[in-house]
Amino acid sequence: MRLLKKMSPELLVILDEYKKWFDQAVNFGHGRLKLPVDEKRIDGHTLASATSTEYLESVMKDSHRGIPEVALVTDFQYTSLVPVRFRNKSAELCDELLEFLGAKFNAVHVHYPTGGFMGWHSNWDCPGYNILMSHSPDGKGFFRYRDSVTKEIITMEDTIGWSCKVGYYGGKEESEDLHYWHCAGSDSPRQTLGFVIPHKEMWEMMIEEIEG
């Protein structure tokens, strides 16, 4: 996974307009709105435990399906009881980004509360070329992965504001060198949008659009 050095002004306008709406919506009225999370997916974990080397080793030994088995996030499309206005606004944003990028579908749009996480997983249930756009208000979030060749655990700290990472997630039947174990978390509110693109040429064209 590599971090893109820049994002196009046109793309940032789309993302910033959404973030402005989101911040106003969660801070409307008395106190900050607490978005719902799927309590069952937490499974007793914390940010520290779900992103630890010990947890990675345990997941790699079991019959992992590819998806995160533990998480503390709000998935705007799939978490129960997400307010309709947030679900609809997420869908609008994803549609606008799909049109901008020329992609066919997005894989995920999630909000991390303070202390939120997605535990170690491989995404080998949905292999392909990936684009991840994340927002951090203060750089206190991170993306962590295991280098499939060196076996080194590498942590990519968030930058302040929007950032974009791109890479490839291999399928379960592909070479182990293409398996991409990763996790993420944040000590402050964070959002991530993920896109999966099946064809390398299309993915490379989308990266050009993103970088402007």
Where are these regions (language model features)?
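Nucleic-acid-interacting cores, centered on viral/eukaryotic replication and modification enzymes
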Residues: 1, 119-120, 135, 189-195
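N-terminal auxiliary "cap/dimerization" subdomain that precedes the catalytic jelly-roll/cupin core
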Residues: 1-73, 78-80, 187, 200-212
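Serine/proline-rich low-complexity intrinsically disordered segments, especially terminal tails, linkers
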Residues: 51-54, 82, 138, 165
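Extracellular-facing segments of soluble proteins and assemblies that are Gly/Ser/Thr-biased and enriched
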Residues: 67-131
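Catalytic core of non-heme Fe(II) oxygenases with the double-stranded beta-helix
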Residues: 102-175
